[in-house]
Amino acid sequence: MKITIHRGASQVGGCVTEIESDGYKVFIDFGEQLPGAEKKEPLKIDGLNYGDVSKSALLISHYHGDHIGKICETNANLRIYMGKTALEIYKCLEQRLSFIPKKEESEKHKEIVERIEKINTFKALQQIKVGKIAVTPLFVDHSAFDAYMFVIEANGKRILHTGDFRGHGFRSKGLLPSLKSYAKNIDYIISEGTNIQRPNATIQTEQELQKDFERSFGKNKYNFVLVSSTNVDRIFSLYHASKKAKRCFICDSYQAKILKIVSENHKQYSSFYNIDYANKTTPAGRFFVLNPNRENFYSFDGELKPYLEKYGFCMLIRSNSRFQPLLDEYAQSDATRVYYSIWSG
């Protein structure tokens, strides 16, 4: 067995790892470098983006661009695997991005949409065989939903590739039991190290953040939250915080589609992912989907505006000019708060 870290050992993002055994190859992640990072020479990797790929497979740990962003550079015949819900979310995101005005960027995302049509999906503990290499995905908690670690077995050796994971999320309590059950007798660990050089970083748990939002929503009537559309657990926690603070919950149709993907796939496992779309009797967590008006901006029209101003709301926003008129309008009120809920690094 041979392990090669092609990229990711000396930087955050742009990850790609290779495990080779008897001519068969498993690659884990093939990502873009993070914006602002020093650009390195493009990678040319036999069995991944050139040469014979009949004995290769690429496994994607999660849908963040620094782990999946280079898939269009792979050989078209390469087998690619990804979590089922993660793939649905990623497809929704890329379809959305394929409509951005800049033609070059739009074409890039259209190419990704076409490429991911051929991706195979897996579920936790569903073993994948590549020659004599066996890979077992383990579900982990991360800001990207449906993320995985991998246990790789070949030539009598066992490797744990952690992917990105966290210990402060809603589903983190399953990490240690999962490792104790399925990651025994590990010979080598390939681990992410995002916070290794941030020893003084303060990390709140997602549960603590939800409580903070709940308290603030209760004190303030008009709440706008700038949040990544694919930070799924954070968004569901905002929904529950709104419900407990007796505020309405508002998002656009694209965000609603992502929430529906997760809810349909996972609400049977946890009520955390269950949204009461049918609620029309109480403002607590009442779900509204906003569509842009004729001028392509978001606004509260008709009977919606007095209802929201009576009971208050939490609205999800993104760095998009469509949301600006609403922000400008409600900026005049002392009851308005805007929250920046995005990783800054």
Kindly give the residue locations of the regions a language model identified:
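Polar/charged alpha-helical tracts
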Residues: 95, 111-114, 264, 305-310, ...
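His/Asp/Glu-rich metal-coordinating catalytic cores
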Residues: 2-59, 66-233, 237-240, 248, ...
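Short, conserved active-site loop motifs that form the nucleotide-linked donor/cofactor pocket
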Residues: 56, 116-120, 133, 273-275, ...
